[in-house]
Structure formats: structure tokens, C-alpha cells
């Protein structure tokens, strides 16, 4: 055994949870991701999906992908920089830019590669990156790849953000990067106050709208639109893997920023471009969420009903303001156990443990879709109450 194998062989935490029968990852789904999914030959209520608009199984989205494959083939065989740009990519970029209210947009192969490529491309050694300490892992990795000076502020603590800004050279670029909706806790960034501090300290703002697009704002344009601050946010990032029912991501900004990123963001230049099917499916989903406002209304009807039911049942759900509902457990082992008990009762939820949260903040994450019914929500709440009570958590 080599030194690397010796080092990595010591990592046996997954095996310990497997031995206890509570390992919760890589569970296999045997069909489309709707509100109910086929797993192990059984129907399971799906409350662990990020498909907020409920479009992943929509026949129009599927058919758009099929047609694109017939026209363009299964892949692009190159990066956008060289032979991998399709007219379909350009159309999607134009429509995304218009949708989020920016001059231009660039499409990347995944949402993760947007943040891991854009962030280091924007700053150098003389600049500063300032992040919320609960920003997504892709933002964390993006700032780690940057040569800039890096600062963090306590979650949604605007006084601490101001303290960090005061540490910066006033003549240097100061890039504040924040999740619009925090993916584990479901709360929103305090964007109005961040914008105020932007002007006070001559900073730049980048908002990750991964969990805001299709959920907040007019026609689902995101948290920036929800606050009426699109024009104050310099860069807007989004993904296709949630409300747009596909895979990929984008960054939108003014033309000068996009021109720079187009020629300097390494994950854009050196990654193969989005497949034709993924691009066409995202484009069709974008059309649907604009054409069907009732879908957004249904999402919020389901969300508000679920929030009411979980609160009435006595769950601790924190400060969530979104279809992401955290049910706090505050114990890693019990978080895995409650996930297993819920699954045994036919409810799929996601466990959240460090490093996705602080050790004292472990939780199970419930997520709503526009297509969830009140009956499905009621059944899920009933089963989760049973699971939590079995572990003396309620």
C-alpha cells in the first residue's frame, strides 16, 4: 500500500454509519424526480429535491432536450472558447441576461464552475473578497483559488460586514459575495443593507441566485428583483439544476465584466460546453416559468402551508423565508437516524451536517416544489413528527 492509500484508508466515518444502518447518501432513484419517486420498488414522497418549479419531469422540457439532441448531437466536443459554442448557447445567454436584468450573461457547464471560475478571475493580490460565513461551498472554493485578500463576516451580521469592509484599502476592489437564499437554512441575504454598505465603501456585489431564481421576484427573477435592487447588484449568478430543470449555470453582469470573464474565467475557457439537451431544456424551462405565473403561486401556496404545518407541529425551523425548511436536530448521529426513520416511513429528506453547517446546527432539510399537494405535505409532516418523537426530538 502506498503512502496515499495509507493516509486515505484511515477515513472510515462513512463505514461506521453504514454499520449502524443510517448512512443517508447516494440513495438510488429509479425514475423521474417528481413529488413522488420510485426507490427500491416503492413510491417515496420527495421532499429533498431542489426542483422548486416542478419542471424536471415536464414533457415540454424533456421534448426540448430530445429535439436539441437530434439537431446538434449528444455533445459539443469542445469548450465555448473554441468549437463548443452553439447558437442555442447564445440564445439562452441573451434570454437569461434579459430575465435577470443585466447586459449580458455567460453559460457554464455547472453552477459550481461558475463560482469556482468567476471569483478568482475577478480579483488579484491587491483586492479583497468578503463573504458571508455560510456561503455555498462553490463560493468558498472560488475564493480559495483567488490570490486576493479574503475576509469573512458572521452570517447576515451587517455590523460585522462593515467591520470587514473597514479593514480594506479604500482604493482596492472590494468584492462582497453572498447567497441570495442560503441553501441549508432557507433565509435571505440582507441585500438592502449590503447595498447601503456597498455605496458607503465603494464595494462590488455578487449574488448567488441558485435558490432564488424561479422562487422570488416577478416571474421568479430572483432575490435581487424581490428587493428591487437588481440595478445595484453588479454580478448575478444562477444555476440550471434547480428551477430550470437541467444542469449548468450562468453569470450575468454588465458588458465590461462579461467581456473580461469570457476571456479570463478558466472554468469557462477550459471546460466542455453545456450539452445541447441541457441547454435546450433550461431554455424551455425559462420560457415556462415566465409564461405560467400560476406555477410560482402554487410554489408559495405549498411553502406557506408547509411552514404553517411544521410550526404547528412544534418543529424548530429557524429564520427560513423560502421553500427550504430546516428542521433542526442539533446532533449529527440523530440527524442521520431521523433521516433513516423518515425514509423507512416513505419520506425522502436530506441530512445537513458539518461542513455544510456548524456542529451545533445539524438539521434535516425539507424542500417544497410547486407540484406538492396539501395531502402530500400533511403526510410528510405526520411521518416526520413520528420520526422526531421516536428520538425524543419533539
Swiss-Prot record:
Protein EC: 2.3.1.50
GO MF entries: acyltransferase activity; pyridoxal phosphate binding
SS bond list: none
Keyword Flavoprotein annotated: no
PROSITE patterns according to UniProt: AA_TRANSFER_CLASS_2
Pathway(s) served: Lipid metabolism; sphingolipid metabolism
Family annotation (CDD domains): KBL_like
Binding site for pyridoxal 5'-phosphate: 111-112, 183, 211, 239
Keywords noted in UniProt: Acyltransferase, Lipid metabolism, Pyridoxal phosphate, Sphingolipid metabolism, Transferase
UniProt keyword Acyltransferase, yes or no: yes
Miscellaneous section: The bacterial ceramide synthesis pathway operates in a different order from that in eukaryotes. Furthermore, phylogenetic analyses support the hypothesis that the bacterial and eukaryotic ceramide pathways evolved independently.
Role this protein plays: Involved in de novo bacterial ceramide synthesis. Catalyzes the condensation of L-serine with palmitoyl-CoA (hexadecanoyl-CoA) to produce 3-oxosphinganine. Also capable of using alanine as substrate leading to the formation of 1-deoxysphinganine (1-deoxySa). Contributes to the levels of endogenous sphingolipids in its host.
Protein name (Swiss-Prot/TrEMBL): Serine palmitoyltransferase
Organism: Bacteroides ovatus (strain ATCC 8483 / DSM 1896 / JCM 5824 / BCRC 10623 / CCUG 4943 / NCTC 11153)
Amino acid at each position: 500500500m502506498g503512502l496515499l492509500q495509507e493516509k486515505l484508508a484511515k477515513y472510515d466515518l462513512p463505514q461506521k454509519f453504514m454499520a449502524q444502518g443510517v448512512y443517508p447518501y447516494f440513495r438510488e432513484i429509479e425514475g423521474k424526480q417528481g413529488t413522488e419517486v420510485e426507490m427500491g420498488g416503492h413510491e417515496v414522497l420527495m421532499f429533498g429535491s431542489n426542483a422548486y418549479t416542478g419542471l424536471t419531469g415536464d414533457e415540454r422540457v424533456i421534448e426540448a432536450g430530445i429535439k436539441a439532441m437530434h439537431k446538434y448531437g449528444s455533445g459539443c466536443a469542445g469548450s465555448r472558447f473554441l468549437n463548443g459554442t452553439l447558437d442555442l448557447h447564445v440564445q439562452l445567454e441573451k434570454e437569461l441576461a434579459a430575465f435577470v436584468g443585466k447586459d449580458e450573461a455567460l453559460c457554464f457547464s455547472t453552477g459550481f464552475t461558475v463560482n469556482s471560475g468567476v471569483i478568482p478571475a475577478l480579483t488579484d493580490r491587491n483586492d479583497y473578497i468578503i463573504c458571508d460565513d455560510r456561503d455555498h461551498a462553490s463560493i468558498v472554493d472560488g475564493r480559495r483559488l483567488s490570490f486576493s485578500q479574503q475576509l469573512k463576516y458572521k452570517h447576515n451580521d451587517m455590523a460585522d460586514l462593515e467591520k470587514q469592509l473597514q479593514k480594506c484599502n479604500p482604493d482596492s476592489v472590494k468584492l462582497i459575495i453572498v447567497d441570495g437564499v442560503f441553501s441549508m437554512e432557507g433565509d435571505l441575504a440582507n441585500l438592502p443593507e449590503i447595498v447601503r454598505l456597498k455605496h458607503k465603501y465603494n464595494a462590488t456585489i455578487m449574488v448567488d441566485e441558485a435558490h432564488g431564481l424561479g422562487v422570488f421576484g416577478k416571474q421568479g427573477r430572483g432575490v435581487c428583483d424581490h428587493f428591487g435592487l437588481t440595478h445595484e447588484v453588479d454580478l448575478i449568478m444562477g444555476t440550471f439544476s434547480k428551477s430550470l430543470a437541467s444542469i449548468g449555470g450562468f453569470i450575468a453582469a454588465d458588458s465590461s465584466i462579461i467581456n473580461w470573464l469570457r476571456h479570463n474565467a478558466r472554468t469557462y475557457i477550459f471546460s466542455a460546453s453545456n450539452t445541447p439537451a441541457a441547454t435546450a431544456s433550461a431554455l424551455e424551462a425559462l420560457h415556462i416559468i415566465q409564461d405560467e405565473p400560476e406555477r410560482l403561486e402554487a410554489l408559495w401556496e405549498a411553502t406557506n402551508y408547509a411552514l404553517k404545518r411544521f410550526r404547528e407541529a412544534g418543529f424548530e425551523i429557524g429564520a427560513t423565508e423560502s421553500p427550504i425548511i430546516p428542521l433542526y436536530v442539533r446532533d449529527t448521529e440523530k440527524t442521520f437516524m431521523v433521516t433513516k426513520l423518515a425514509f423507512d416511513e416513505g419520506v425522502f429528506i436530506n441530512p445537513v451536517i458539518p461542513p455544510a453547517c456548524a456542529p451545533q446546527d445539524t438539521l434535516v432539510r425539507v424542500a417544497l416544489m410547486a407540484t406538492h399537494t396539501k395531502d402530500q405535505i400533511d403526510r410528510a409532516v405526520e411521518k416526520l413528527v413520528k420520526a422526531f418523537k421516536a428520538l425524543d426530538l419533539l
